[in-house]
From Swiss-Prot:
GO terms for cellular component: cytoplasm. Its main location: cytoplasm. It comes from Flavobacterium johnsoniae (strain ATCC 17061 / DSM 2064 / JCM 8514 / BCRC 14874 / CCUG 350202 / NBRC 14942 / NCIMB 11054 / UW101) (Cytophaga johnsonae). This is NAD kinase. NCBIfam families: PRK01911.1. Pfam families: NAD_kinase, NAD_kinase_C.
Length: 294
């Protein structure tokens, strides 16, 4: 069995998690291939001393891997998706962060859950990705032009609102006068969109969510649309540029550029461990049922 390992930041709280993962897989003769920057950081911290194979930080994995394990929070998983792309290699998130809707494996029961991996006692779920094209062409979106959580447009270098002219399948929807606009997948519905008043979608729902950020018109509410919709955006504002973010990757775009957003023809696979369901995660992370009056 060959497993890719990726992590982004090193904190003292992650040290026992990293040690447990490496000790477990080494004792079970699992071949680990580590993202090169993460491995260098582990060498610097003297957490590992053994030589390991690496994979580069700017390329995709091939399908020879059983899975990619992400050590960190949800942000780390979103970055890890860039290594997976359309390879079909599933992602497993081990939560060394805080909230963790995607990184569901908790450090308290890590040995049991890693044994599920060894025994291949897991399933996978598919997550929709959003692809982005920009006219005129923007170099920033040449390769990593997809998002697992959301595509967001927002104002830049100004406190003034922007206007986001929005079309669905070439039919005019609205011109949002707001701080920005979020186009979210079901996976991203528990992220930025949720904090702006958007609904929660279960991962298997075939829909997207359009959520305005602090709209001037309070009747501009979040909208759920079919996931086969092509969304076209044209942004104007007082500044010459605005910001476009694909999950955690952010770039400046010229006003009047045309953005086209639609789901990609491939999906990301997420590893689902027995007992760690989406509904259980919702209850635990959002503290549903904690009010004893219920």
């Amino acid at each position: 069995m060959k497993i890719a390992i990726y992590g982004q930041y090193y904190q003292n709280s992650t040290e026992p998690i990293i040690k447990d993962i490496f000790a477990f897989f080494n004792s079970n003769n699992v071949e680990m291939v580590i993202e090169e920057n993460f491995l260098n950081m582990l060498y610097e911290k003297q957490l590992v001393k053994k030589d390991y194979k690496t994979f580069p930080s700017n390329s995709a994995l091939d399908n020879s891997f059983e899975m990619l394990i992400s050590i960190g929070g949800d942000g780390t998983i979103l970055r890890a998706a860039a290594f997976v792309r359309n390879s079909g290699v599933p992602l497993l998130g081990i939560n060394a962060g805080r909230l963790g809707f995607l990184a569901k494996v908790q450090k308290e029961n890590i040995d049991i859950l890693l044994q599920y991996v060894i025994n291949q006692n897991y399933t996978t779920s598919e997550r929709t990705l959003l692809g982005l094209t920009c006219e005129p062409f923007n170099e920033a979106f040449k390769e990593l032009n997809f998002a697992m959580n959301e595509v967001t447009v927002s104002r830049k270098d100004t406190t003034s609102m922007i206007t986001v002219e929005t079309y669905l399948n070439n039919e005019y929807l609205n011109s949002y006068w707001a701080d920005g606009l979020i186009i979210s997948t079901p996976t991203g519905s528990t992220g930025y969109s949720l904090s702006c008043g958007g609904p929660i979608l279960t991962p298997d729902v075939k829909s997207l969510v359009i959520t305005p950020i602090a709209p001037h018109n309070l009747t501009a509410r979040p909208l759920v649309i079919p996931d086969d919709t092509e969304i076209t955006l044209r942004v104007t504002g007082r500044e010459d540029q605005y910001l476009v973010s694909l999950d955690s990757r952010i770039s400046s775009v010229q006003n009047e550029s045309v953005l086209k957003i639609k789901k990609t023809d491939y999906k990301i696979k997420m590893v689902e461990i027995p007992g760690e369901t989406f509904l259980k995660t919702l209850r635990n992370k959002l503290l549903w049922g904690e009010d004893k009056r219920n």
